[in-house]
C-alpha cells in the first residue's frame, strides 16, 4: 500500500511566527498540507509561496482566492485537478471558501478538501453542506478543516458524514498555549488504512495545534475526471 502523510493546521495568517510555521511544516514532512487562515490580503501570494518554499513543499492553490485556505504538497504528489472556492460573503461575517483537489501518489488518486467554517452556527452549517455537495468525485476522500465548532454539532456532522474522525482521541486543539476546545479536524474515507494520528505542539508559532495523520491509500483507487459539482 502507498503511504501518505497529511497535515491540517490553522496558521493564523502567519502573524505569530512565519519562520516557525515553515520550520514546523518542514519537520513534519507532509505529503499534503491543508492550511487554514493562510495569508489572504495584499501580496499574500508571495507570502504563501515563501512559506511553501521554506517548508520544502509546493504551493498548489489557495490563499486569497480560497478565502485563506491553502493547499501545499510534497514533490512526490502529482496534481490532477485543483481549484479555489470563494463562497458569497455574508453580512458582518468573514468570507469563507475552500481548496478542492484531486491528487495522485504512485498512480493512486484521492480527493482533498481544506476549509475553515464560520463563527455563526447557521452559516457554519450552510457552508458545510455546500462544500460536502462539491467534494471531489474521486474516492477516497480527505478533509482538513477548522470547524469553529465541536464534535456533535450540526456543522461537524454535516462535514464528517461517512468519514472517519481521525483526531477523535487526541484531545483539544485550540488555543495552542492551553488547549480547551477541539475545533480542528482531519476526516478520512474509511478506505484509508490509518497507521498513526498525532497532535504535535510546535510551540507558539500560531494559536492552533496541527493534526498529522500517517495513512495508506487503498490498493485500487476509483478515478474520475475531476472534482464534483461547483459550489453555489
What are these regions (language model features)?
Residues 32, 37-109, 198-202:
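Structured beta-strand-rich core segments of catalytic domains in phosphoester-bond hydrolases
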Residues 3-13, 81-83, 100, 109-118:
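Active-site-proximal beta-strand elements of phosphoester/diester hydrolases
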Residues 11, 38, 115-117, 145-147, ...:
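Active-site metal-binding loops of divalent metal-dependent hydrolases
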Residues 1-50, 129, 217-232:
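N-terminal, active-site-proximal structural segment of metallo-dependent hydrolase catalytic domains
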Amino acid at each position: 500500500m502507498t503511504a501518505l502523510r497529511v497535515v491540517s493546521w490553522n496558521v493564523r495568517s502567519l502573524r505569530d511566527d512565519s519562520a516557525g510555521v515553515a520550520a514546523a511544516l518542514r519537520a513534519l514532512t507532509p505529503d499534503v498540507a491543508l492550511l487554514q487562515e493562510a495569508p489572504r490580503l495584499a501580496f499574500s501570494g508571495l507570502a504563501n509561496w515563501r512559506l511553501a518554499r521554506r517548508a520544502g513543499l509546493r504551493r498548489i492553490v489557495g490563499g486569497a482566492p480560497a478565502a485563506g485556505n491553502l493547499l501545499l504538497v510534497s514533490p512526490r504528489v502529482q496534481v490532477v485537478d485543483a481549484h479555489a472556492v470563494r463562497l458569497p460573503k455574508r453580512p458582518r461575517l468573514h468570507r469563507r471558501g475552500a481548496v478542492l483537489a484531486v491528487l495522485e501518489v504512485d498512480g493512486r488518486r484521492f480527493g482533498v478538501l481544506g476549509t475553515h467554517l464560520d463563527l455563526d452556527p447557521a452559516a457554519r452549517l450552510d457552508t458545510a453542506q455546500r462544500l460536502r455537495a462539491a467534494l471531489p468525485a474521486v474516492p477516497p476522500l480527505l478533509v482538513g478543516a477548522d470547524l469553529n465548532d465541536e464534535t456533535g454539532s450540526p456543522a461537524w456532522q454535516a462535514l464528517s458524514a461517512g468519514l472517519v474522525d481521525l483526531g477523535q482521541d487526541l484531545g483539544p486543539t485550540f488555543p495552542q498555549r492551553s488547549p480547551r476546545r477541539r475545533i480542528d479536524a482531519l476526516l478520512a474515507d474509511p478506505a484509508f488504512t490509518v497507521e498513526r494520528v498525532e497532535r504535535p505542539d510546535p510551540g507558539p508559532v500560531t494559536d492552533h495545534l496541527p493534526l498529522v495523520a500517517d495513512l495508506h491509500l487503498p490498493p485500487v483507487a476509483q478515478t474520475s475526471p475531476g472534482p464534483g459539482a461547483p459550489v453555489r
